[in-house]
From Swiss-Prot:
PANTHER family: RIBONUCLEASE M5 (PTHR39156:SF1). It comes from Lactococcus lactis subsp. lactis (strain IL1403). Mg(2+) 2 binds at residues 60, 62. It holds the Pfam family DUF4093. Residues 8-91 form the Toprim domain. This is Ribonuclease M5.
Length: 206
């Protein structure tokens, strides 16, 4: 029997189909919000889980999923976050976007990004060493400590440009941090400690 890679943190998902898909590949426990609903009792439980085990928010890459993520982000600021691109969460037939539709490679990459590594496990369950990705490890300590400014965003055309939305969509998808609008983008990039060097490298391909 193949041994699945264990995820110590509790993964927060929207429904049981998301749970089932994750458990196909990983030894993990999930907390289901029950679709788009999340209340104060859920948030209190998630706070306790974060204190005891840590949580990874892994909601769907759609409006409701981002709404739930933002609510949890405000209530549990230390929570980790995993993201799927919209294409990775698209069903083969009709239906809405969801973690339940993602294949192993997409799930594995999303979880690896949480820990700053290349991959959590291979498809057969063998654990891999979680090494920092090359673009992050090459960044100096000084750069990591420097937060992005509104001027930086403007210089990359992420705000105040005719195609700013498309630029943000491209950048956020490549960095796997979930879409952020013009008001959110600076906070989102700084939260994930994204540097100007990383943005430059990504936007070269825009």
């Amino acid at each position: 029997m193949v041994e699945k890679q264990k995820i110590n943190e509790v993964i927060v998902v929207e429904g049981r189909d998301d749970t089932a898909n994750l458990k196909r590949y990983f030894d993990c426990e999930t907390y289901e919000t029950g679709g788009s609903s999340i209340d104060d009792r859920d948030l209190e439980r998630l706070k306790r889980l974060e204190d005891k085990r840590g949580i990874i928010v892994f909601t769907d890459p759609d409006f409701q999923g981002e709404r739930i993520r933002k609510i949890i982000m405000q209530a549990v600021p230390n929570a980790k976050h995993a993201f799927l691109n919209r294409d990775e969460a698209r069903p083969k037939g009709k239906g809405s976007l969801g973690v339940e539709h993602a294949n192993f490679e997409a799930l594995n990459q999303a979880l690896a990004e949480v820990f700053g590594g290349e991959k959590v496990t291979d498809e057969f369950g063998s654990a891999k060493t979680q090494e920092p990705s090359s673009d992050r490890s090459s960044v100096s300590k000084k750069e990591l400590l420097t937060e992005l400014t509104q001027t930086d965003l403007m210089s990359f055309g992420l705000v105040m440009a005719a195609d700013s939305r498309k630029r943000r969509e491209f950048l956020c998808e490549q960095l796997r941090i979930g879409y952020a609008n013009g008001k959110q983008i600076k906070k989102r990039l700084n939260m994930f400690k994204i540097t100007k060097e990383q943005i430059e490298n990504v936007m070269k391909n825009y």
